[in-house]
């Protein structure tokens, strides 16, 4: 083992009491060591050409020294440190720390007992794989333990894209692979890098953030108890009801008057030690909860010393103290959990306000609350929040809304049965909803499991040996005449003993969150209800803090927690905007964006694409004359801003019926197989976009630009057409603009590739659908504007990207039967999205290997940081090694977080020098002090100008940094990239590689098809199947994107 750490996948760290040789002993573990590893001639056409007298724009780029013309003739894991021994693996041992949460003693053993450290298994040496080949497709990997990340030859230095069988002299196979090396399972040896310092570039300002300082005593203890309930309640709400009743009955007696906070599951935190180590209680609930008696067992489990938390916040200890922070967070949530509706980390109540958003739903208002460790200390992040709930209306009224029937009309004819489509729509909308009936003279609540396939008039059941209909039963028993007898009936209970509930006697119970996908009307209503300008939002947050009145909260006071009622104020900086370069043929060759936005007036694209073969198909009700005018204006706009766009379509522009989309597209492809661009005017109703994109991109190989009928399209709005032209240019392989100066002065001299990655998950209630992972990578150095995308399906809700790197076992060569019989000599084909993109970069950049790799990873929550670092960084390293064992580029891995609740507000509202037009902080505002992590490398960056509402800064957190960026370098790199987004002339809120990955993943969801048979077996190093201890569920393979489509930014 080498004696220095930090060179491997996971650099070695030094514990507070650590040794230096990678095997250090002591209560704080050791310091790990070791290295880880002119137009072409136009065809004669009968239809008119599209263009204007001064059209044409710039032609293709000329040869060196040529002149650019205009018009139609233009030329142009180490061991854990909890008191154990650290052993370096790959990159060495990790930081050692003393445990902060101590285990509770057994009932007969006085005093606390420390949690024992579990050692990791010894490392398996890296070995070489005898057969390496590139994979041309990005597909999900099978669930098997991944082989090691070594490779035999340099694929980058050989024929890229061709599968290679590596043999050792005389045609004999190379030495066999050894058994797979285990993925590291300990997180103690894995830690994000420390902050390299604070940024200094930019104009210094002061901002406020919706964080409130929390103070706790340095020497207090919080005691942890395990809670078990028998029989287990079905919901957390009942758990809390049981524990509230226990507190009411026994707080002053058996609990010794000590306050506690309950997490709604199995953890109970107390402000002092309870008079017992273990005790059972019997709690019986009232009639509303069916008078069930619960046995509650409370058993001491451990304690948290707040001293360790203070040491961590002060930067003197690396252990994150997450258990202690979680305990304090539960304490602060105890009172609102008993009084409000809980949705994740937010609390909602009608007392905060409600607003109708249409079609049977309403928006409830509330607040979000989360405790976080920051540089200024513990911080309570509070933000106003809104979410949709079911309106407490009759089920009949809801069904009318659901089916799009105005509530002031008579609605569907009760005498007419619902169509199969309507019945399925209602079934999906009402499944799992709790309803209340009052026809029995009392209130009864039921949970809907399904709706019947038969109408109410055909439902029979047996009672007292006789068979009667539901209609007869209600008439005789309740004197109630049912009207909607042709509609289906709600069904509750289980299939063997169903309970039939006519819709007209049921009302939806208040307080149920709607978690399914909203329609366009509801989305608009929700945005209207929640969108608030910065000054108003800040005031609402302060009012919410005052309403919560934390000093008067007995539980908070008993735990000796003090919360400031003033927003945190902190220094910030406004980074300078980059200068953009456009083509020299334009009147303006450079552009200095002001407040994050600019336009294309007097500018020409720096790399205008050439589109010779195109056409347009209209699926809407637009008149064909309007379609011709649109095409003419669009061609003119493209030529005017720098493209070379043929005025004559390849085949005549025409219209087709929306119900004949596949046939129409196929006919176009047959007539024009070399089509470069297809302009599609979408049908007037929604639902066709995905079908068009799937057929064009995976079946026909057509790059398409869809246009939605509307006012801007019909009026031929100039700004609209310019934005469409920007998208068309990059889809055709062009480049809109580039940065005038290097991305980072002094920071990216070497060849660099920038990746973006994201995973999108199916909508709530659609868990049978796969999650889609997408990885994009820049293909042009040094401009860094063109990104190639690959996509892959993986198991539902799986956040770890499984297909970054894969190794697929292949059959043994027939010339080596003995090796095959031995069972240990295996050949593999290496693949995966990361590897394929690296190879594409190599082939497109004069066979230059990137020396720096920057990986922006979107969609990862705080709790997934170590998991992503363990598996995805491992996959990245293996993919690099599989190309060339001697190839060791420097990798930086940055998590991009947009779904957080931190908001930045200007020091003084209304001052033009401090805000943009919307009243938000100016683009380029960066914060890396008070509200950021105590010791790790992170920052908040507001890179865009607000349009409406309050801008949300993006949080960037560095998980791995071999490039050793300074704070200024990474912040400027990220901010400058935000000005290179291809689809608009604005800086964007998220760094473009991550933005593109999100677009690509979202696009790929349209590709989902029925299962396809596939006998290949592959294993992925980027997945967490090993951690899960079993095989992930099978997923449908995505259809392959055609090569000509995949090579351009088709997802824009």
UniProtKB/Swiss-Prot annotation:
Pfam families: ArgoL1, ArgoL2, ArgoMid, ArgoN, PAZ, Piwi. Residues 40-49, 97-117 have a biased composition (Low complexity). Keywords: RNA-mediated gene silencing. The keyword Ligase does not apply. Residues 394-510 form the PAZ domain. Residues 173-183 have a biased composition (Pro residues). GO terms for molecular function: RNA binding; RNA endonuclease activity. Expressed in seeds. InterPro entries: ArgoL1, ArgoL2, Argonaute_Mid_dom, Argonaute_N, PAZ_dom, PAZ_dom_sf, Piwi, Piwi_ago-like. Residues 1-127, 170-194 are annotated as: Disordered. Residues 677-1009 form the Piwi domain. GO terms for biological process: regulatory ncRNA-mediated gene silencing. Belongs to the argonaute family. Ago subfamily. Probably involved in the RNA silencing pathway. May bind to short RNAs such as microRNAs (miRNAs) or short interfering RNAs (siRNAs), and represses the translation of mRNAs which are complementary to them. This is Protein argonaute 14. It comes from Oryza sativa subsp. japonica (Rice).
């Amino acid at each position: 083992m080498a004696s220095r750490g930090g060179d491997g996948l996971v650099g070695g760290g030094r514990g507070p009491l650590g040794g230096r040789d990678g095997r250090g002993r002591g209560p704080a573990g050791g310091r790990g060591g070791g290295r880880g590893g002119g137009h072409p001639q136009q065809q004669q056409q009968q239809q008119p050409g599209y263009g204007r007298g001064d059209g044409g724009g710039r032609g293709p780029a000329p040869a060196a020294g040529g002149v650019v013309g205009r018009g139609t003739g233009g030329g142009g894991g180490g061991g854990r440190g909890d008191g154990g021994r650290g052993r370096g693996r790959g990159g060495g041992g990790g930081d050692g720390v003393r445990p902060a949460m101590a285990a509770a003693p057994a009932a007969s053993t006085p005093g606390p007992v420390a949690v024992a450290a579990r050692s990791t298994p010894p490392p398996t040496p890296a070995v070489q794989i005898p057969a390496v080949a590139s994979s041309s497709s990005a597909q999900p990997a099978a669930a098997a333990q991944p082989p090691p990340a070594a490779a035999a030859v340099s694929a980058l230095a050989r024929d890229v894209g061709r599968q290679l069988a590596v043999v050792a002299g005389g045609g004999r196979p190379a030495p066999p692979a050894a058994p797979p090396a285990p993925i590291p399972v300990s997180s103690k040896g894995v830690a994000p890098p420390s902050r390299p310092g604070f940024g200094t570039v930019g104009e210094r300002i002061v901002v406020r953030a919706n964080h409130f300082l929390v103070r706790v005593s340095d020497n207090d203890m919080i005691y942890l108890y395990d809670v078990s309930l028998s029989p287990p309640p079905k919901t957390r709400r009942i758990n809390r009801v049981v524990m509230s009743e226990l507190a009411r009955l026994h707080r002053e007696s058996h609990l010794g008057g000590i306050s506690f906070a309950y997490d709604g599951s199995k953890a109970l935190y107390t402000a002092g030690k309870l008079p017992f180590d273990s005790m059972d209680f019997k709690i019986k609930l009232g009639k509303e909860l069916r008078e069930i008696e619960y046995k509650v067992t409370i058993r001491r489990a451990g304690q948290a010393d707040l001293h360790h938390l203070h040491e961590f916040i002060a930067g003197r200890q690396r252990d994150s103290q997450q258990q202690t922070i979680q305990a304090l967070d539960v304490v602060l949530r105890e009172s609102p959990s008993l009084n409000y509706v809980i949705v994740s980390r937010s609390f909602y109540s009608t007392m905060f306000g409600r607003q109708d958003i249409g079609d049977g739903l309403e928006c409830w208002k509330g607040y979000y609350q989360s405790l976080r460790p920051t540089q200024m200390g513990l911080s309570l992040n509070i933000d106003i929040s809104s979410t949709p709930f079911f309106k407490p209306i009759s089920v009949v009224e809801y069904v009318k809304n659901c089916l799009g029937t105005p509530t002031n009309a008579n609605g569907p004819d009760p005498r007419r049965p619902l169509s199969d489509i309507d019945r399925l729509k209602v079934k999906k909308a009402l499944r799992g909803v709790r309803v209340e009936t009052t026809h029995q003279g009392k209130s009864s609540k039921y949970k809907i499991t399904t709706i019947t396939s038969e109408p109410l008039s055909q439902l029979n059941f047996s009672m007292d040996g006789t068979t009667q209909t539901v209609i007869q039963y209600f008439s005789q028993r309740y004197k109630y005449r049912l009207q909607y007898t042709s509609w289906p009936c709600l069904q509750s209970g289980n299939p063997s003993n169903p309970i039939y509930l006519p819709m007209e006697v049921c009302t939806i119970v208040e307080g149920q969150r709607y978690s399914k996908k909203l329609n366009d009307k509801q989305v608009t209503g929700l945005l209207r209800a929640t969108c608030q300008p910065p000054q108003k939002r800040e005031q609402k947050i302060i009012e919410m803090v005052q309403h919560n009145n934390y000093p008067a909260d007995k539980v908070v006071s008993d735990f000796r927690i003090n919360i400031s009622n003033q927003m945190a104020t902190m220094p910030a900086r406004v980074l300078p905007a980059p200068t953009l370069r456009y083509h020299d043929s334009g009147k303006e060759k450079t552009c200095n964006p002001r407040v994050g936005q600019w336009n294309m007036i007097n500018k020409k694209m720096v790399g205008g694409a050439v589109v010779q073969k195109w056409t347009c198909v209209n699926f809407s009700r637009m008149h064909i004359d309007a379609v011709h005018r649109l095409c003419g204006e669009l061609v003119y706009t493209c030529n005017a801003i720098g493209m070379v766009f043929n005025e004559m379509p390849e085949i005549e522009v025409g219209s087709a019926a929306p119900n004949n989309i596949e046939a129409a597209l196929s006919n176009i492809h047959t007539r024009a197989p070399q089509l470069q661009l297809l302009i599609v005017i979408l049908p007037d109703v929604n639902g066709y976009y995905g079908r068009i994109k799937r057929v064009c991109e995976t079946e026909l190989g057509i790059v398409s630009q869809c246009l939605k009928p509307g006012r801007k399209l019909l009026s031929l709005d100039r700004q609209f057409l310019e934005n469409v032209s920007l998208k068309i240019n990059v889809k055709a392989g062009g480049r809109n603009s580039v940065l005038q100066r290097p991305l980072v002065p002094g920071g990216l001299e070497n060849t660099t590739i920038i990746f973006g990655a994201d995973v999108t998950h199916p909508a709530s209630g659609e868990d049978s659908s796969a999650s889609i992972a997408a990885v994009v990578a820049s293909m042009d150095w040094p401009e860094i504007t063109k990104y190639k995308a690959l996509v892959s399906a993986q198991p539902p809700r799986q956040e770890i990207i499984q297909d970054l790197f894969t190794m697929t076992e292949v059959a043994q060569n027939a010339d080596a039967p003995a090796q095959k019989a031995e069972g240990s000599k295996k050949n593999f084909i290496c693949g995966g999205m990361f590897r394929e993109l690296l190879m594409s970069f190599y082939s497109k950049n004069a066979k230059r290997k990137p020396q720096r790799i920057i990986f922006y990873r979107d969609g990862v929550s705080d709790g997934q940081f170590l998991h992503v670092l363990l598996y995805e960084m491992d996959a990245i390293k293996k993919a690099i090694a599989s190309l060339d064992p001697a190839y060791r580029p420097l990798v930086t891995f940055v998590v991009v977080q947009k779904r957080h609740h931190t908001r930045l507000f200007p020091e003084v509202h209304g001052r033009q020098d401090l805000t943009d037009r919307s009243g938000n902080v100016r683009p380029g505002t960066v914060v890396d002090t008070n509200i950021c992590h105590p010791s790790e490398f992170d920052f908040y960056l507001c890179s865009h100008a607000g349009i409406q509402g309050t801008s949300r800064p993006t949080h960037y957190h560095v998980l791995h940094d071999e490039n050793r960026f300074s704070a200024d370098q990474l912040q400027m790199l990220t901010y400058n990239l935000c000005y290179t987004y291809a689809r608009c002339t604005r800086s964007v809120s998220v760094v473009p590689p991550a933005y593109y990955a999100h677009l690509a993943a979202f696009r790929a969801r349209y590709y989902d098809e029925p299962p396809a048979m596939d006998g290949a077996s592959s294993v992925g190093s980027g997945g967490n199947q090993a951690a899960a201890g079993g095989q992930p569920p099978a997923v449908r393979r995505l259809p392959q994107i055609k090569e000509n489509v995949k090579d351009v930014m088709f997802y824009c």
